[in-house]
């Protein structure tokens, strides 16, 4: 039996910070557009009962990636409880080449989760072959995490891409009233298990994760001026790392976590600077006319993307991380490069989320929601979260990188904006 103590350690850090600041009104996924055309798969209801529906969580995760289209339970030709009970032909006849079965049973002060991934068409040799199996013991609090672990393993086995269902998102909520209406929150990628990291009477903006997932940098106006704050998620300790005259904003950790790129108008014009992650004397990278903001590092740390209106309207530019000349990339702003360096996501002139292949230069519009902002990629590049305007407020939106699946994560207690997807939080 495999215990998830090591795997949940980083998640426990966030829970420790938020243990006295639970946010009851969570953001939850509401499907806007399904995954027709994705690979059909079956996640058979797990045997046994628990406070969380493990098989539904697994099916939802696979669906959210845009790579899979889990069939409804009512469409399943059988509901096997073991590999021996699986009739491969019954599944292959309806176009299903892999199924997930499992069970969840009480174990001590928690539950044991066991699953098997089964090949129904013989792609691995013989129909009915168990492609993968595993079991975990988790406490009640970590049931969803255990389900996300199943999802990650199944996803990676079937796609050869590391799953990102055990990652988290940080975002800002502006509540409807109260003495401290601005909050930085962290939640599972799907909006569950939400906690407040910090709250303030003054605006908070632009949270950014450190590459080890243990710190958040964000913009705070708590002292009546914009400051960059880095908060340790182990202990909750906060440090102001930039409080220069003028505006200080848009922090971004370098890939090795040692530096922060940010925008500041300390000299009268908004420019891109780089300094140590713990503060210090900044180095100015951009200059000249126009405002420069929203820096984002390339995966190798050698270059920085940023938004500038130097040409008269906002566009995304790219320059060496040590400074120098900049070249136009395109789009309107909020650029981010995938971890493999192959894909760029950004906002275009119509305020839509766009994906650009950096090898071919081909672009694809992924969203047509109103006033899209702040797109953030999952660490495997498979999903994108961003904010948009619905009615009179801001909500989070999720879209798969292939555009197949779209969903909203509306907040019930205020406007939700500035999403940032965490790095991988497990080894």
Swiss-Prot record:
UniProt keywords, alphabetically: Cell cycle, Cell division, Periplasm, Signal
Protein name per Swiss-Prot or TrEMBL: Tol-Pal system protein TolB
Record flagged with keyword Amino-acid biosynthesis: no
Protein family per UniProt: Belongs to the TolB family.
GO cellular component, one term: periplasmic space
Stored InterPro entries: 6-blade_b-propeller_TolB-like, PD40, Tol-Pal_TolB, TolB_N
Residues spanning the signal sequence: 1-23
A Pfam family: PD40
Its job: Part of the Tol-Pal system, which plays a role in outer membrane invagination during cell division and is important for maintaining outer membrane integrity.
One GO BP: protein import
Subunit description: The Tol-Pal system is composed of five core proteins: the inner membrane proteins TolA, TolQ and TolR, the periplasmic protein TolB and the outer membrane protein Pal. They form a network linking the inner and outer membranes and the peptidoglycan layer.
Gene field: tolB
Major place of residence: periplasm
Cross-referenced SUPFAM superfamilies: TolB, N-terminal domain, Tricorn protease N-terminal domain
Subcellular location: Periplasm
Keyword match Cell division: yes
